[in-house]
UniProtKB/Swiss-Prot annotation:
Family membership: Belongs to the peptidase M20A family. N-acetyldiaminopimelate deacetylase subfamily.
GO biological process, one term: lysine biosynthetic process via diaminopimelate
Pathway: Amino-acid biosynthesis; L-lysine biosynthesis via DAP pathway; LL-2,6-diaminopimelate from (S)-tetrahydrodipicolinate (acetylase route): step 3/3
EC number: 3.5.1.47
Entry keyword annotation includes Flavoprotein: no
Name of this chain's protein: N-acetyldiaminopimelate deacetylase
Length: 376
């Protein structure tokens, strides 16, 4: 069956997922596609494994930015697609192949239908980690092309195709990685009194961490601690000398993030004393909350409702993390959910976005960009 150009691009990208700052093949694909366009009014830069493209407007007064994240996840794909990932153990399980395709579609429209204002497209690496938005924003490559307004999107499996969802103000949570390493004293399983068991210490720690949210965060201010991975020990008859906990922290306010981390540190100090061990806490990457500019978001929602065939709804804030929040901290703009009607959710090995969304998104976003970019 013949598919449209942009559906094929999405499938091409889906085959080659790459993790953060290793998206060399993806970067080359983007550059090769850009090379097929008329470049009379186009400038292109690379930044690490990302790509920054500027389309010069006819009579620019501002720069409008569109950000698309391009990285995949370390997940083994189970979609059954004929165009499934050819990179073992990696998958586009968060829809970044769709985000990038929509960006290339918008770029194509922008080249053929120039508007007054300049447009900048940020094909950003490493959203899933260690975080590409902040260093890209601070880079020399972007300095002279820094947008005055910026927008981004994220696919939403739970919404139907043709639906977008967003809200003014807080949309996504503050997030932080969490790594805790415990080191005690190993020994023979027959002589537990001579050792300091880090499996037991880790078990106590996981249990105690559950009280951080329930007894330290205002119930009206949501927060979540998730421990997603525990490692420790070597074989069944040796008391473990080391253990490691890996997880995430998510809060809707910066104040709650500080409070949660303070309580984690106090609990870990107690574990050190109780089990006579050493502990190291590493918060890894932290993503700033996604906070939509109220006026721009309201204006966008009204435009979509009145002038496109898309259905726009007001959603509630989510505990999702997104490094686009760093861009919105410095640049007025917004992010929205784009419905893709998938039975399976984000970060699932069977995620299958409905490809019908690609042309719809390119069309309505092109309408919005033209409207916004030709207004004086």
């Amino acid at each position: 069956m013949t598919v449209s150009k942009f559906v094929q691009i999405r499938r091409d990208l889906h085959r080659i997922p790459e993790i953060g700052f290793k998206e060399w093949e993806t970067q080359q694909y983007i550059l090769d596609y850009i090379g097929t366009l008329s470049l009379e009014f186009v400038e292109v830069k690379t930044w690490k494994t990302g790509v920054i493209v500027k389309v010069n407007g006819k009579n620019p007064e501002k720069i409008i930015g569109y950000r698309a994240d391009i990285d995949g996840l370390p997940i083994t794909e189970e979609t059954g697609y004929e165009f499934a990932s050819i990179h073992e153990g990696m998958m586009h399980a968060c829809g970044h192949d769709v985000h990038t395709t929509i960006g290339l579609g918008l770029l194509t429209k922008a080249v053929s239908e120039r508007i007054d204002d300049d447009l900048v497209f940020l094909f950003q690496p490493a959203e899933e980690g260690p975080g590409g938005a902040l260093p890209m924003l601070e880079s020399e490559e972007l300095k002279e092309w820094k947008p005055n307004i910026i927008l981004g999107l994220h696919i939403a499996p739970e919404y139907a195709v043709g639906t977008i969802a967003t809200k003014e103000g807080l949309l996504f949570a503050n997030t932080s990685e969490l790594y805790i390493d415990l080191k005690g004293k190993g020994g023979h399983a027959a002589y537990p009194h001579t050792a300091n068991d880090m499996i037991v210490a880790a078990s106590h720690l996981v249990t105690q961490l559950q009280s951080v949210i329930s007894r330290n965060v205002n119930p009206l201010d949501s927060a979540v601690i998730t421990i997603g991975k525990i490692t420790g020990g070597t074989v069944q008859n040796i008391i473990a000398e080391k253990s490691r906990l890996e997880g995430t922290i998510r809060t809707l306010s910066v104040e709650s993030m500080k409070r949660v981390k303070s309580r984690i540190e106090a609990i870990v100090a107690g574990i050190e004393a109780s089990f006579q061990c050493e502990a190291i806490i590493d918060y890894g990457a932290m993503y700033h909350q996604v906070y939509n500019h109220e006026e721009l978001t309201r204006e966008f929602m009204q435009f979509v409702h009145k002038q496109t065939d898309m259905n726009v709804i007001t959603c509630t804030e989510a505990m999702t993390g997104e490094d686009f929040g760093y861009m919105l901290r410095e640049i007025p703009g917004f992010m929205f959910w784009l419905g893709v009607n998938s039975e399976y959710g984000l970060h699932h090995a069977k995620l299958k976005p409905d490809e019908e969304v690609i042309e719809k998104a390119i069309t309505f976003l092109s309408q919005y960009v033209k409207w916004k970019g030709n207004r004086k």
